[in-house]
Amino acid sequence: MVALKGVPALLSPELLYALARMGHGDEIVLADLNFPASSICQCGPMEIRADGLGIPQLLEAVLKLLPLDTYVESPAAVMELVPSDKERGLQTPVWTEYESILRRAGCVRALAKIERFEFYERAKKAFAVVATGETALYGNLILRKGVLALNPLL
């Protein structure tokens, strides 16, 4: 937790540091409690702990600071359901919540859905993985950092 003006208090110093160091196109994974964060981070990404936080509340806080990439089809991606979960009709209401939060932050593009093992491979290339306490199944979310137009052309 940090005590700074304009910075959401639930963002840890480690997460703020990662967000600041990320460049255009870098990705960050907001991982649910079932995600193998420590194993994935052995491949390179920085592991950041946010135990006890849900991804929706963390997403709202992160999006106050992180610009999303507007040069890609979708700057946000979730893990697609495996076939057996699709067959049994498993619902993913957390995705609707993510889409609502993303829209409020100005992102009108749909969530990309990535096959499970492709998601793991993409996560291995992320800048950081934030291990949360999110309990929703298929709650994992990848965000791609965009650019800030600090000196817009006249």
Curated annotation (Swiss-Prot):
Transmembrane segments: none annotated. Its EC number is 5.1.3.29. One of its GO terms (biological process) is negative regulation of neuron differentiation. Keywords: Isomerase. One of its GO terms (cellular component) is cytosol. Belongs to the RbsD / FucU family. Involved in the interconversion between alpha- and beta-L-fucoses. L-Fucose (6-deoxy-L-galactose) exists as alpha-L-fucose (29.5%) and beta-L-fucose (70.5%), the beta-form is metabolized through the salvage pathway. GDP-L-fucose formed either by the de novo or salvage pathways is transported into the endoplasmic reticulum, where it serves as a substrate for N- and O-glycosylations by fucosyltransferases. Fucosylated structures expressed on cell surfaces or secreted in biological fluids are believed to play a critical role in cell-cell adhesion and recognition processes. This is Fucose mutarotase.
